[in-house]
């Protein structure tokens, strides 16, 4: 099996920064996939800030990165970019993938700058239907004690304090806080659902739970969709 490294670094509010960092230094041979251009479809309206890409869109991006049958993908990044790629790969049927925990800083080998010549591959998507949840189902099940909602945003955003990202601020009623940058807290039993601001950092607690043998679902639209639909919210 061939190993493919993929750099998924990005910065919220600075779309070009991820590629700039990649060009400065990356794991030799690594491809680059952009969270907003490749791992999202920003043309989709009313679905949050980072809607999921279609199967065809993701397949094209994955193929450009050299991902296909017989490849083991190792993703690294920042702000949940690597976990977003991990989640999308599994969502579209490619389970041979992992995340370099600690990101590029954990890589002990040489680095290289500039562009890479990546041999393209054919990525054939086979989308799962059991790993996402939509706002309507969550709304209907807010009083369902078997649904375990986890909010991956920072504590101040989870509490609903004023901040420059969430408008309006708040959280989905009943959601527990599991900040993406912290270790996964101990969670009770239940049907795990993760969300964040836009469906990127929510993939971090899902990945950590998976490492512990627990599957969960992603709410792709997350708070940036929920908050615009007039649905219930909590603060404090």
State where each predicted segment sits.
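Cytosolic catalytic domains that perform sulfur/thiol-centered chemistry
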Residues: 1-236
